[in-house]
Amino acid sequence: MGSKGLKGVMVCLLILGLVLEHVQVEGKSCCRSTLGRNCYNLCRVRGAQKLCANACRCKLTSGLKCPSSFPKLALVSNSDEPDTIDYCNLGCRASMCDYMVNAAADDEEMKLYVEHCSDACVNFCNGDVGLTSLTA
């Protein structure tokens, strides 16, 4: 793996670490609808939890279950939104793997980057983040 590829992997790991920290915080907010969930997620990029929950009509909770009137729990695989993992994979691949493809020197290196990056995204979105998937 060339030095450009190693730098790309390191950038990917750093960003995934930052996103993972952010995801753990969002697991404690419940929204009435997918629109409310999307509003909350967008707001949380820069806004505080309480401010975003109020603005998007969501509710903060300390448990893993949402009240029946607030069924949309963020990024929990057994919530009412099983597609969150698919959206996570798609977003991760679009943002991280595209960068790595552009850093590849040749087709063989590009295939290797895409394979490792896709595996890392799947592991990240399923909650199994580990360095072994990138260094294998």
From Swiss-Prot:
Gene3D superfamilies reported for this sequence: Thionin-like
UniProt propeptide residues: 73-136
Listed transmembrane segments: none
One MF annotation (Gene Ontology) recorded for this entry: toxin activity
A UniProt-annotated Pfam family: Thionin
Binding partners and assembly: Homodimer.
PANTHER family assigned: ALPHA-2-PUROTHIONIN, THIONIN-2.1-RELATED
Protein name: Beta-hordothionin
Gene name in the database record: THI1.2
